[in-house]
Amino acid sequence: MVLKREDCWYKSTCTYELCANCIRYFEMKYLMEHSGLSKKRQQPISLKATQDKDAFKLLNDIRLDIVNFVNNGESLYIYSEYTGNGKTSWAIKLLLRFFDQIWAGNGFRQRGYFIHVPVFLNQAKNFEDNKARQQMLKMLSEIDLVVWDDIASTKLSDYDIQQLLTVIDQRISDGLANIYTGNLTSHNAMINSLGNRLASRIWNTSTLVEFKGKDRRAEW
């Protein structure tokens, strides 16, 4: 297989025509292929701070120090009552920045994972192979950084809450980093959707960043 420069995440600065001998390419490729991100989402979009400038500044500060954020086992909840204003895009941007900072010497180790929570919960109920299910839960309990996208969008069943609580509680107790996105804008609203224990673990252990701007997808 010929690996071309246009397939590289660093094509704007890389001078190699082919990637076959590039360690960075293969290590980044492994991180991406085991990140849960679709091909489209592996290339971050530019996010303009025309609204929510303070929130964008705080997130950019976290982005610039993302390795310490992860190493310190910190958590972040990006939320808004509106859709399409950059919550998920920012979460992915932070994940990709982490990959960019730790690829050197990483080898072939899985370090970060993106989960769209509604899809994950549906899959968790329908795993035909219990071994595969246990492997997934083990990975989520041990990996350095997990993005829990759309974690607080609808009221969850007791079963769904328990599935999330088992993993998230373990991660927080073990000092592993989490980034959550959702549309619940208060602790009480989160309790109503996720139950008291899970809501408190997320809300009380996270840096809270609220987006107040409305849908901005047309700008991007």
Give the positions of each predicted feature.
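Walker A/P-loop nucleotide-binding motif
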Residues: 71-92
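Conserved alpha-helical scaffold flanking the Walker A/P-loop in AAA+ ATPase domains
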Residues: 64-67, 124-146, 162, 166-170
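A short, basic N-terminal segment
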Residues: 1-64, 207-213, 217-220
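Loop/turn-to-beta-strand initiation segments
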Residues: 111, 142-145, 174-180
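A short hydrophobic beta-strand->loop->alpha-helix junction that borders the nucleotide-binding pocket
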Residues: 109, 114-124
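Conserved catalytic network of the ASCE P-loop NTPase/AAA+ motor domain
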Residues: 69-70, 105-107, 138-141, 169-174, ...
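Post-Walker A helix-loop "phosphate-sensing" segment adjacent to the P-loop in P-loop NTPases
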Residues: 95-112
